[in-house]
């Protein structure tokens, strides 16, 4: 129950070398049937290049980047998550949370890392709908759980997970051309869990400063219960933009998408922009650049 496929926990203790980052690499590895697939935890596990990983059937997380709040090593290391400043490409995680705990396929607690062309799919959940909307458990069976800042996600996918597709809790992250598809998928849930419960995109109120460019939410199967919401956004969110987005559900059809395409739980703060299909909603009035002398425009 405690075996991981790969663990990095590098600490260059007080040596103050000219290059403080360990700069390890991890490439072209398949990992099946472990407690955790890959865990990158160390303060000096930085400057890494991680690519072409296939991780399947883990009891807990498939990929864990950084130490979560409450991790005993995090408490001993100045409450820092570690594992910052890394690059990930072509990561494929599926069938995580086989222990039916509260784990997501990919959990990110670090900062300033980049993820491209990566997928987290078919992760498990047996807890009911309430668990998806409680702070301590809402990442159960999710594709991606992001409790870090200043990260970038480019062309990544959450597909057919039993929980939410993307759960974005913290701010100043960027998402470009990413997909959330068929969350709370009926073939991935078990026990008290059901289809038609989760969101393809769940954006928490502390995700301020984040930008979502061309994100898609899609339930493509006419025969399958999948996500309840396309974009579920908590109240009091501020400084958050979703642009050129789309939310489709081929089972219920376009005329039944009210309250499901976009669902915001209450009032929003300043500088919020939501553009999903035909919806254009902003909590600010657009301003023009000011023309100054010599034909210069400033804003």
Predicted regions and their residues:
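Flexible, active-site-proximal loop/turn residues at the rims of small-molecule/cofactor binding pockets
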Residues: 12, 44, 69, 112, ...
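Glycine-rich, flexible loop segments associated with nucleotide phosphate handling
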Residues: 17-26, 45-48, 77-88, 133-143, ...
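Short glycine/acidic-rich loop motifs that flank beta-strands on beta-rich extracellular proteins
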Residues: 1-4, 35-41, 59-65, 96-109, ...
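Extracellular beta-strand-rich solenoid/capping regions of secreted or surface-exposed proteins
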Residues: 1-25, 33-45, 65-72, 203, ...
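All-beta strand scaffolds that present successive hydrophobic residues in beta-strands
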Residues: 21-27, 47-53, 72-77, 83-93, ...
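Short, structured patches in soluble enzyme cores that scaffold and shape functional sites
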Residues: 10, 30, 42, 52-57, ...
């Amino acid at each position: 129950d405690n075996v991981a496929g790969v663990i990095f926990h590098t600490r260059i203790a007080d040596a103050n070398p000219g290059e403080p980052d360990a700069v390890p690499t991890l490439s072209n590895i398949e990992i099946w049937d472990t407690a955790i697939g890959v865990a990158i935890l160390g303060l000096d596990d930085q400057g890494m290049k991680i690519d072409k990983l296939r991780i399947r059937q883990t009891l807990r997380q498939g990929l864990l980047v950084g130490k979560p709040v409450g991790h005993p090593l995090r408490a001993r290391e100045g409450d820092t998550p570690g594992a910052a400043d890394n690059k990930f490409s072509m990561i494929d995680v599926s069938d995580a949370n086989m222990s039916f705990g509260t784990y997501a396929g990919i959990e990110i607690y670090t900062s300033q890392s980049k993820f491209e062309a990566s997928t987290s799919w078919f992760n498990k959940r047996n807890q009911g709908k309430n668990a998806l909307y409680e702070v301590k458990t809402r990442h159960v069976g999710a594709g991606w759980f992001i409790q870090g800042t200043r990260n970038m996600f480019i062309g990544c996918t959450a597909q057919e997970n039993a929980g939410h597709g993307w759960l974005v809790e913290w701010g100043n992250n960027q998402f470009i051309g990413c997909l959330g598809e068929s969350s709370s998928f009926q073939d991935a849930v078990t026990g008290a869990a059901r289809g038609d419960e989760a969101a393809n995109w769940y954006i928490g109120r502390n995700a301020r400063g984040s930008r979502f460019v061309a994100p898609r939410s899609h339930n493509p199967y006419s025969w399958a219960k999948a996500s309840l919401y396309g974009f579920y956004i908590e109240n009091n969110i501020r400084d958050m933009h979703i642009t050129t987005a789309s939310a489709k559900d081929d089972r219920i059809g376009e005329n039944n998408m009210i309250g499901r395409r976009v669902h915001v739980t209450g009032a929003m703060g300043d500088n919020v922009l939501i553009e999903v299909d035909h919806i254009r909603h902003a909590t600010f009035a657009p301003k023009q650049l000011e023309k100054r002398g010599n034909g210069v425009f400033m804003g």
